[in-house]
Amino acid sequence: MNRRPFHFVSITDRELMQKLSDLHPYAKMLPQADWAILVCGDESVSGPFYMDDCAAATQNILLAAHSLGVGAVWCGVDHTERQQSFGELLGLPEHIKAYSLIVLGMPAEEKKTLDRVEPDKIHENRW
């Protein structure tokens, strides 16, 4: 179908970044970041399936950031008061739902890449 229900809010305003950080317990690094992107979904376009498209869009942004040497953190925006608070703060229309907050910036330090391959979770043809 390729309905593309996602929208993006680019956030660079320091005061706004602080307010968002206050609303999200896992985004405390936000006030020190260079930039953030709020990934949102249009529920009127694809109902609850907007979440799948927003997850793919979020992952693509993370991969692009990594390829450019930019640090990025995916902070989920759950479907409770936090989603409503983000919507009110950023003026989102009722049918637009905050999905994820991506915090971006140049890394302060280089970290070793972890090997997270778990062979016991890979199955071929059958379980």
Regions found by a protein language model. Name each.
Residues 1-127:
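Acidic, surface-exposed loops and disordered segments
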